[in-house]
């Protein structure tokens, strides 16, 4: 039962509710789920087709938003008349919902309307009880939830279905214009088959584990219930209490691994794979002979075969019956995607078809996955693809200076094996993000500014290569390049010492005899290699003494806030990787988060942290010992994040 507006609570799960707080008139769609309590805002999308163009907006959101989520309201950044702005947002949200339903029946549901005062930044929430009322009711309270990802994924799972289709159809050679109608008829025939009694849906877990894996569940088209309201479907308390296989819940295929880390993102959520098969050979009550029908063409005809690669992702609560998850989430998602592909292909039906590929992403700040179609006829760096990604960044409120929706960023929905480790190209295990979980810095009133994203820890003696005493800067460079790889700025492999040396020879910085030597390199050489291999520019800071480094803590903090890249520190014959600073602006007290490439042991996180090979270092420790030597010159290499999407 939906609560009255006087007692209603708006729950905000998304971390970033305002995508463009300084742009009056901006309209955002509030996204919720029929499976969550009423008025729960999971995410928000910016309206990018202005006036707005509801048809274009609905086309985009139908492709972008997984089934299991829906538009529950709107938010406008407006003036001081909060209720007036909120009413405009409600009216727009209701119109969008009608377009998304494509003429289907919509209940006169309560809609959330919100307005943000552009001057103060205050957000006011209201509830619209009915489409026919012009009065809004203020909500009782607004709660901004912590650990919202945990709430989403501990109680829910993803259903993934891939379905490649080769769709042949004929059209009269004398009437090419009829091809569009014939193609549409072929699409409709496929959609009809999804609900046929002889269609079989096989559901199986999409994640391997060391323990037992549940057996796949077979669901037949004749057993599915279509058209049910997802929010009113009876939930199931436990798979163990269900004897009818048709009423098994999604939790039956979810892994209850108590030793696994907390599930707080789509990447490590439980996933169920759905396969679609046709079972035309089901046992018949009477025997019969095979029959073939022949329909001669009345005139010359042409054959077209269209390749359609469907790939849908949906969200379901774990206590939802699998039968309803397939019939009310997966199948409608397949139908919507077929229609979306049809719209794109129709203008090119008689020429070269666009090579469409569907990818799923879970960008930072968005709690749930989103889906996008890319044309592979165009390379990722071509302007048409860049413009597509820019619009997606704008809609989702993502920064426009980093690649978050490239193909390399896509979710990997293949079968995962938790026992496998990250392996580098030479077969040795590389540790990632070793600074996570280390003790605090000891700067009592400090503000920590640290690296953004992930990196791999490179250090002495890895890969069986003895670089002890001379390879620390090479290892720091490898860590930096691994950061650019893991943030998907590049796909090149992390170079070996020899490849780094060869690069410096190729640009004319070193003689050919340098290749294979044990000579040191410094910040200047690292900047040359980053420019040559990645096209990355660098800023270099020079210090006459290590005692000067604490004076630049504020500037270093700004680097980590704005650029977020690892910094190489070179002093004397030693090199380190700087991952962050903790700085108290009042007292000037500071600490440096150092990743030390001089470590020579095994890939043991506990040993590395306990040995101080990754940790916070004060410029002068409690015993009066200086970490940065006063009698040595220091150079800091600050790689600049490329401005790209």
From Swiss-Prot:
It is an enzyme of class 3 (hydrolase). GO terms for biological process: proteolysis. The active site is at residues 472, 596, 598. The modification N-acetylmethionine is found at residue 1. Gene3D superfamilies: 3.90.70.130. GO terms for molecular function: cysteine-type peptidase activity; ubiquitin-like protein peptidase activity. Keywords: Acetylation, Hydrolase, Protease, Thiol protease, Ubl conjugation pathway. Its EC number is 3.4.22.-. The keyword Acetylation applies. The keyword Transport does not apply. Thiol protease which recognizes and hydrolyzes the peptide bond at the C-terminal Gly of UFM1, a ubiquitin-like modifier protein bound to a number of target proteins. Belongs to the peptidase C78 family. This is Probable Ufm1-specific protease. It comes from Arabidopsis thaliana. The lineage of its organism: Eukaryota, Viridiplantae, Streptophyta, Embryophyta, Tracheophyta.
